[in-house]
Curated annotation (Swiss-Prot):
Region of interest called N-terminal domain similar to Nudix hydrolase domain, as start-end residue ranges on this chain: 1-170
Effect on the protein upon substituting residue 195 to A: Reduces ITGB1BP1 binding
Source organism, top-level taxon: Eukaryota
PANTHER family named in the record: KREV INTERACTION TRAPPED 1-RELATED (PTHR13283), KREV INTERACTION TRAPPED PROTEIN 1 (PTHR13283:SF11)
Domain FERM: 420-734
Family annotation (SUPFAM superfamilies): Ankyrin repeat, Second domain of FERM
Name by which UniProt lists this protein: Krev interaction trapped protein 1
Keyword Transport: no
InterPro entries cross-referenced by the UniProt entry: Ankyrin_rpt (IPR002110), Ankyrin_rpt-contain_sf (IPR036770), ARM_KRIT1 (IPR056485), Band_41_domain (IPR019749), FERM/acyl-CoA-bd_prot_sf (IPR014352), FERM_2 (IPR035963), FERM_central (IPR019748), FERM_domain (IPR000299)
Protein task: Component of the CCM signaling pathway which is a crucial regulator of heart and vessel formation and integrity. Negative regulator of angiogenesis. Inhibits endothelial proliferation, apoptosis, migration, lumen formation and sprouting angiogenesis in primary endothelial cells. Promotes AKT phosphorylation in a NOTCH-dependent and independent manner, and inhibits ERK1/2 phosphorylation indirectly through activation of the DELTA-NOTCH cascade.
Entry text on domains: The FERM domain mediates binding to RAP1A and RAP1B and is necessary for binding to phosphatidylinositol 4,5-bisphosphate (PIP2).
């Protein structure tokens, strides 16, 4: 046995891409990968299980790479066909993680083993053996506090997700990671027996019919080369890629043996077939499989319009990873391009498998009229580059096809033309127009930089996309205009709403992840104003449920902010009519309580105006308003929609539509109709679990042992936000 101190804990993440196209993408998507995980029972709980990464031990003096590859093969033999096991391409050390408990002071290494792209091979499920899981499904429920994973495995999976995201942004890294191993790339190895460099190697050690001297003499007798040409690229570090003209995948591969009884043998006169007939078959198959591509390629405007009316997708990629608009732009079909953009609402920056855009194709073909159409489109990214970092102008000047001079002139002029703008609204209804330097490829981060906010103020806010009944916070790398374009599909995925009644707009709003301790330190008047406008909006809409006394105080502050100091002649009993109350009292209280509050509101308003200890500067009053809002449980929450079921009688259930609020304090349920706060749970006092179908999640309160299920298509978003915000509470906030 080896020395225990020389034995290292090693965890292995075996990952494989679902398709080859994802390897060339600069944007990381977890759903494009699968990861190999074990399921092991939780100690003391027979029925419950948790997922763990593959784990092995490494001797300090052993060959690590081969040891890990052999371990993966042996571990996966029971689940693979013919007991072959999964053979990794290489072993990459990602990171070392400190261990807890008895092993404190030691570290465990996480090794990544990339495997082949997923195919139709069917793996058998064997109890106790690992199986592949979709990485996106795993990351949706992965957190260090989740009962679904071992704590160390959860930390490693979160680090792996971040690592893959960073590596996708590096050119050529991901394709190199999944490239076949050097051993796989060696096809033939030839050794010259006459080449003996070791002094101890004699003719007897060659074990061949000829001695080394005889072989050497025969070689010298052969005709020698007159010229020797060296490859100047050999041994250099220059990047190169093999250009593939066409990739053809056998659709029947992996489907098993065919039913030979159904195979029809053609007549003998048809046996001799030329390559041209084979090509014709392939073209006919392409025409049948991709009618929209064919009509775009041929410029058949009538057929193209009819297919679009039949809901054929403009985003579908064919076997060459081209979309219909790529064919229209490459072959110079002007009307087809216009129809795809206008009627088909096609993304003008849609990329093919080699990351080339429609503008690249039109410029490369020298089709000036199509270049003009694309440049006139408000969402086109004029600065877009392909996989090799080339702009459309570079491609145009390289190819020099057709009317390339005119196309190049248009591209050069477009660089200095004014950019399209998008309105970013604030919650008070005002907006700022921001330039879209990259069309609909412009990211949230780039829009935030165009908002003319200071660096300090930017960190408190982000861009939200909102319609009447759905609001989503976007991430810095998201492209808001593409979300606006895809809003009907997003609505269908997350709600049952009618897209015709939901018009999306972009808003500058408080970042839901902003800790209250940080917000309390804000002094910038502009930041305070933006926060105030949003808090006032949520208060009046009824999302801030609070005691009557708190709502009356907030109403008096709003009167001071809107109308200035109290004047007895001006602000009489009838001053607070129904119209004025709408601007200071939540909509849920207007009819039930607001008429009885008028005297109390005016009284507090008068006291506030005459108080010498209160600053009447606008940002100080707005800050006082925020200070009162900070105490409300739902302050700063992102709201989702859902339903809960309660027993109306022993025989049936009552459906209650609810708002699900998630903030840095915890989770809150509001009755959708009355805005009454049904339940408010702080982190640490409840547990959650995502349902199997991602259409519900379960909440268990540890204080009163109560459990309930919320049914919503947004369950995945709710659980992911809970995992992000859990643990962000400051110690001083936990008891407040």
């Amino acid at each position: 046995m080896g020395n225990p101190e020389n034995i290292e804990d090693a965890y292995v993440a075996v990952i494989r891409p679902k398709n080859t196209a994802s390897l060339n993408s600069r944007e990381y998507r977890a759903k494009s990968y699968e990861i190999l995980l074990h399921e092991v029972p939780i100690e003391g709980q027979k029925k419950k299980r948790k997922k763990v990464l593959l784990e092995t031990k490494l001797q300090g003096n052993s060959e690590i790479t081969q040891g890990i590859l052999d371990y993966v093969v042996e571990t996966t033999k029971p689940i693979s066909p013919a007991n072959q096991g999964i053979r990794g391409k290489r072993v990459v050390l990602m990171k070392k993680f400190p261990l807890d408990g008895e092993k404190m002071g030691r570290e465990a290494s996480l090794f990544i083993v990339p495997s082949v792209v997923k195919d139709n091979t069917k793996y058998t499920y064997t109890p106790g053996c690992p199986i592949f899981y979709c990485l996106q499904d795993i990351m949706r429920v992965c957190s260090e506090s989740s009962t679904h994973f071992a704590t160390l495995t959860a930390r490693m999976l979160i680090a792996l997700d971040k690592w893959l995201d960073e590596r996708h942004a590096q050119s050529h890294f991901i394709p190199a990671l999944f490239r076949p191993s050097p051993l796989e790339r060696i096809k033939t190895n030839v050794i010259n027996p006459a080449y003996a460099t070791e002094s101890g190697q004699t003719e007897n050690s060659l074990h061949m019919g000829y001695s080394a001297l005889e072989i050497k003499s025969k070689m010298l007798a052969l005709e020698k080369a007159d010229t020797c040409i060296y490859n100047p690229l050999f041994g250099s570090d220059l990047q190169y890629t093999n250009r593939v003209d066409k990739v053809v995948i056998n659709p029947y591969f992996g489907l098993g043996a065919p039913d030979y009884s159904k195979i029809q043998i053609p007549k003998q006169e048809k046996w001799q077939r030329s390559m041209s007939s084979v090509t014709e078959d392939k073209e006919r198959q392409w025409v049948d499989d991709f009618p929209l591509h064919r009509s775009a390629c041929e410029g058949d405007s009538e057929l193209l319009s009819r297919l679009l009316s039949e809901r054929f997708s403009v985003n579908q990629l064919d076997s060459d990873h081209w979309a219909p608009i790529h064919y229209a732009c490459w072959y110079g079909k002007v009307e087809a391009t216009r129809i795809l953009l206008e009627k088909g609402k096609c993304n003008p920056n849609l990329l093919n498998g080699q990351l080339s855009s429609p503008l690249h194709f039109a410029a490369g073909g020298g089709h000036a009229e199509i270049v003009q159409i694309l440049l006139n489109h408000p969402e086109t990214d004029r600065h877009i580059t392909d996989q090799q970092g080339r702009s459309p102008l570079n491609i145009c000047e390289e190819n020099k096809q057709n009317n390339w001079e005119e196309a190049a002139k248009l591209l050069k002029e477009a660089i200095n033309k004014p950019y399209e703008k998008v309105r970013i609204y604030r919650m008070d209804g005002s907006y700022r127009s921001v330039e879209l330097k990259h069309g609909n490829n412009t990211t949230v981060q780039q829009i935030m930089e165009g908002m003319r906010l200071s660096q300090e103020t930017q960190q408190y806010f982000t861009i939200w996309i909102c319609s009447e009944n759905l609001s989503l916070q976007l991430k810095p790398y998201h492209k808001p205009l593409q979300h606006v374009r895809d809003w009907p599909e997003i609505l269908a995925e997350l709600t049952n709403l009618d897209p015709q009644r939901e018009t999306p707009q972009l808003f500058l709003r408080r970042d839901v992840r902003l800790p209250l301790e940080v917000e309390k330190q804000i002094e910038d008047p502009l930041a305070i104003l933006i926060l105030f406008d949003e808090a006032r909006y949520n208060l009046l809409k009824g999302f801030y449920t609070a005691p009557d006394a708190k709502l009356i105080t907030l109403a008096s502050l709003l009167l001071q902010i809107v109308y200035g100091n109290y004047e007895s002649k001006k602000h009489k009993q009838g001053f607070l009519n129904e119209e004025n109350l709408k601007s200071i009292v939540p909509v849920t209280k207007l009819k039930s309580k607001a008429p009885h509050w008028t005297n109390r509101i005016l009284h507090e308003y008068k006291n506030l105006s005459t108080s010498e200890g209160v600053s009447k500067e606008m940002h100080h009053l707005q800050r006082m308003f925020l200070q009162n809002c900070w105490e409300i449980p739902t302050y700063g929450a992102a709201f989702f929609t859902g339903q809960i079921f309660t027993k109306a009688s022993p025989s049936n259930h009552k459906v209650i539509p609810v708002y699900v609020g998630v903030n840095i304090k915890g989770l809150h349920l509001l009755n959708m109709e009355t805005k009454a706060l049904l339940i408010s749970l702080k982190y640490g006092c409840f547990m959650w679990q995502l349902g199997d179908t991602d259409t519900c999640f379960q909440i268990h309160s540890m204080e009163n042992k109560m459990s309930f299920i919320v049914h919503t298509k947004q369950a995945g978003l709710v659980v992911k936000l809970l995992m992000k915000l859990n643990g962000q509470l400051m110690p001083t906030e936990r008891n407040s």
